[in-house]
Amino acid sequence: MEQYLELCRHVLEHGTERSDRTGTGTISVFGYQMRFDLQEGFPVVTTKKLHLRSIIHELLWFLKGETNIAYLQENGVRIWNEWADENGELGPVYGKQWRSWEGANGKTVDQISQVVEAIKHQPDSRRLIVSAWNAAEIEDMALAPCHCLFQFYVQDGKLSCQLYQRSADIFLGVPFNIASYALLTKMIAQVCDLEEGEFVHTFGDAHIYLNHIEQVKLQLTREPRPLPEMRLNPEVRSLFDFTFDDFELVGYDPHPHIKGEVSV
């Protein structure tokens, strides 16, 4: 995961200090891109241990179209707790927008189902896009979408995905986002009878919170280890049939976990 470490170095060297919504403060750059060849291994950070269970369950939760954290809590995932109300609700966040985007005419659109069908039947389309940024509903969301738009591209029997992330917490959030969208790409590739291609990660405001700088510097002292392999149950033929037990990460040998506080 040299690409991730290079991002960290770039922001430490070229970032400027900025205030932010949370009051923590950041060093930030605007505009950056990383590319990962998914056939070279599963892009999960090895310079600290990630909680893969949280990544997988969060993605499955998005795909269910849910916006209440009950499913996450039942599966030991706490990453959304700080933003939920007393009933566990988050408002019309990612799952709602992915699976039931509501238009001005009251019609709902299942963007995920639409994009999977388009990949299968119109692979050359330039409209293979899913957006979580519904401007009419931003104010009702507990947290505006950080990873807000992604597009697929089919070439030579391979499926690639590019994510645009408007706001990127480099220490805590970005490693999760890389793994999540790489996994989504693999899942969709499987159900569309394609091989996986590239994951392209494009950032708007890429930042390191001031209370994460020492943790990032610690990661930069650690040597990256070989990427693991993510195995999917080949029997699953529908994107919405995947369960947690259908995933196996083989050969993940990370450095120890590094703790960092979440800025809410």
UniProtKB/Swiss-Prot annotation:
Which superkingdom?
A: Bacteria
Keywords (alphabetical) are:
Cytoplasm, Methyltransferase, Nucleotide biosynthesis, Transferase
Q: Which GO terms describe its molecular function?
A: thymidylate synthase activity
Q: Give residues annotated as binding (6R)-5,10-methylene-5,6,7,8-tetrahydrofolate.
A: H51, D169, S263
* Positions annotated as active site in the UniProt record: C146 (nucleophile)
Q: A GO CC term?
A: cytosol
Q: What is its main location?
A: cytoplasm
Could you tell me which SUPFAM superfamilies the record lists for this protein? Thymidylate synthase/dCMP hydroxymethylase
Enzymatic reactions: dUMP + (6R)-5,10-methylene-5,6,7,8-tetrahydrofolate = 7,8-dihydrofolate + dTMP
Q: Which residues form the signal peptide?
A: none
Pfam families (UniProt xref): Thymidylat_synt
GO BP field: dTMP biosynthetic process; dTTP biosynthetic process; methylation
**Residues reported in the UniProt entry to bind dUMP:** R21, R126, R127, R166, S167, A168, D169, N177, H207, I208, Y209
**The protein's Enzyme Commission number:** 2.1.1.45
Record's subcellular location: Cytoplasm
Q: How does it assemble?
A: Homodimer.
**What is the annotated role of this protein in its UniProt record?**
Catalyzes the reductive methylation of 2'-deoxyuridine-5'-monophosphate (dUMP) to 2'-deoxythymidine-5'-monophosphate (dTMP) while utilizing 5,10-methylenetetrahydrofolate (mTHF) as the methyl donor and reductant in the reaction, yielding dihydrofolate (DHF) as a by-product. This enzymatic reaction provides an intracellular de novo source of dTMP, an essential precursor for DNA biosynthesis.
Protein name listed in UniProt: Thymidylate synthase
Q: What organism is the protein native to?
A: Halalkalibacterium halodurans (strain ATCC BAA-125 / DSM 18197 / FERM 7344 / JCM 9153 / C-125) (Bacillus halodurans)
Q: What is the lineage of its organism?
A: Bacteria, Bacillati, Bacillota, Bacilli, Bacillales
